[in-house]
Amino acid sequence: MGRVVAELVSSLLGLWLLLCSCGCPEGAELRAPPDKIAIIGAGIGGTSAAYYLRQKFGKDVKIDLFEREEVGGRLATMMVQGQEYEAGGSVIHPLNLHMKRFVKDLGLSAVQASGGLLGIYNGETLVFEESNWFIINVIKLVWRYGFQSLRMHMWVEDVLDKFMRIYRYQSHDYAFSSVEKLLHALGGDDFLGMLNRTLLETLQKAGFSEKFLNEMIAPVMRVNYGQSTDINAFVGAVSLSCSDSGLWAVEGGNKLVCSGLLQASKSNLISGSVMYIEEKTKTKYTGNPTKMYEVVYQIGTETRSDFYDIVLVATPLNRKMSNITFLNFDPPIEEFHQYYQHIVTTLVKGELNTSIFSSRPIDKFGLNTVLTTDNSDLFINSIGIVPSVREKEDPEPSTDGTYVWKIFSQETLTKAQILKLFLSYDYAVKKPWLAYPHYKPPEKCPSIILHDRLYYLNGIECAASAMEMSAIAAHNAALLAYHRWNGHTDMIDQDGLYEKLKTEL
């Protein structure tokens, strides 16, 4: 009798294990990976996506990466007399863990962001000037603004603390189907509320004074996003975090991360411009009709096309920037009308006319960077000494005592304006570009899932545009594409992740 019972228990146990291996997610067989994936845009978002898609789908999938200009996208550099300088995104926060990982994995080197003293100019005078002495800076800030600088630091730290949860979620492979759901998983209704309120409104409600907001907050928004405190509060917090210490950059230029990720992902770069994308039915080698995406692109004057199982769009869907048409989708893919901010970067090698900002002699000026307030009638957002991408230390003056200065402005500077800023100069180069979204809360972020297997990364820029935000969006899109391909619905848009993962420690 005992033997019969033992055999029955053994049989039931075997049956249970068999059922579990068939039904439990851990034991479920993965669907065969896609044959081909297309990524449109080879900036930090597109190349990060290629890197993470390769990790998830394995070595056999073919990844084509389309770029009509240079790898690196908006992480562009400008040349001044044979030296390269960052045109835009130049510093990285010490808590930007994706960027830190990329630099480590790719064998690149990090350099500390250049230091130097900073001043704030209101159109008439310097309302604040940094000192070389920390205690003097503290006294100046407390004397003029009370303890508002400390309160501001605490507010930004609270936002960053919640934001850091994304790294734990992504390390456990969780993904989100919309920007709003991602932000809600990090900071709940508070983060969503920040998208729908201006930074000015948020900080006024928190009790910050008009003087502090005008003199200390608005200039940071102007240098980082070319806009005022009317931007949304979330991107405002991201911008203010760039005032922290420990900022760094990639030696040789931040765009090296993009070329490194492209190479590490073993993706195929296609130097062409994508014209349109259309869903079509195609018979694959299995003999079964399959829904695929035809990507039609142009190289020079030649038009070509290819079919893909999955497509990721990693360039802003703005007519002035990508001009991609989505053909015959049902329902139609919505038009995107996100306006991007026009900004002009000007690099000038010359001797600054310090009398614009101060009556002190030029050798006593001492400031490396000057930011401007919103009510300044000066025609620039900011001006500062910049190192080349190869310099590891703060830049030294050339033999004639001149530096290379980077100027951000809303409009292209005229020669007369440059001559007003500089006593003399021997080189100037300008780059007008659409750098980041024009923020006007309340913000409605574009969908991440445009169609069944068609994804959009740059919608995250409506929350905040930054290198790390693009890398986060890329990792999320790669995870989302992977889980939806394999039917892992339990890994998408999960509620209570923070508490769930906290209990697993």
Curated annotation (Swiss-Prot):
One of its GO terms (biological process) is prenylcysteine catabolic process. Glycans are attached at N196, N323, N353. Keywords: FAD, Flavoprotein, Glycoprotein, Lysosome, Oxidoreductase, Signal. It catalyses: an S-polyprenyl-L-cysteine + O2 + H2O = a polyprenal + L-cysteine + H2O2; S-(2E,6E)-farnesyl-L-cysteine + O2 + H2O = (2E,6E)-farnesal + L-cysteine + H2O2; [(2E,6E,10E)-geranylgeranyl]-L-cysteine + O2 + H2O = (2E,6E,10E)-geranylgeranial + L-cysteine + H2O2. Its main location: other. Its EC number is 1.8.3.5. Residues 1-27 form the signal peptide. Its cofactor is FAD. GO terms for cellular component: extracellular exosome; lysosome; very-low-density lipoprotein particle. It is an enzyme of class 1 (oxidoreductase). Widely expressed. Gene3D superfamilies: FAD/NAD(P)-binding domain. Pfam families: NAD_binding_8, Prenylcys_lyase. It comes from the Eukaryota. One of its GO terms (molecular function) is prenylcysteine oxidase activity. It is found in: Lysosome. The keyword Signal applies. Belongs to the prenylcysteine oxidase family. Prenylcysteine oxidase that cleaves the thioether bond of prenyl-L-cysteines, such as farnesylcysteine and geranylgeranylcysteine. Only active against free prenylcysteines and not prenylcysteine residues within prenylated proteins or peptides. Involved in the final step in the degradation of prenylated proteins, by degrading prenylcysteines after the protein has been degraded. This is Prenylcysteine oxidase 1. The lineage of its organism: Eukaryota, Metazoa, Chordata, Craniata, Vertebrata.
